[in-house]
Amino acid sequence: IECDVVRDQHGFLRLPFIFSSVLQVKPGRTIFVETAIRNHELPVLWSDDIKREVDLLTEKIDAKLIAKRRDMRDMPFVTIDGQDAKDFDDAVLVEKKPDYFNLYVAIADVAEFVRPFSAMDEEARTRGTSVYFSNCVLPMLPDKLSNNICSLKPEVDRLVIVAHCKIDYEGRPLSQDFYE
């Protein structure tokens, strides 16, 4: 229950308090999470336009998209997200060579699925990031994207943007490249 604390003309608390609203705790959240969501006006729902855009997305990646990209599916990338994460959006690989290291950083290619200036794009810009609490997440993108299509799960084809850097044994970059 939320109440307004009212003081009289001398600064003393006036009783009884004025009850202004009831804060409901959603399943999987705590009163502290609900309070943070309310106090910071964090968005938790998706508009009908975004729901329609998400419904049009397919989880199977078009073979034509895969054919245009560098195939790195046989490389042993590891995700750098926690074990309990659902949205594995980045992965790394380091290879030791005779004179240098190859560092690869793969990031889920969200832009392939979120069109510029679409409702989803505008909402993602507004949200700016996913908000992580100890027991729940308020995602920047709908679940179908963040936890499925753009999640770098093992043994599942995903589209990524890769940064590749050759680094000498002193830690100096020798070259870099970016590709899909």
Where do the protein language model's features map onto the residues?
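Polynucleotide-recognition surfaces of large bacterial nucleic-acid defense/processing enzymes
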Residues: 157-180
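Charge-lined substrate channels and their catalytic hotspots, especially those that engage the 3′ end
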Residues: 1-104, 111-156
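Residues within well-ordered beta-strands of beta-sheet-rich folds
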Residues: 102-106, 164-166
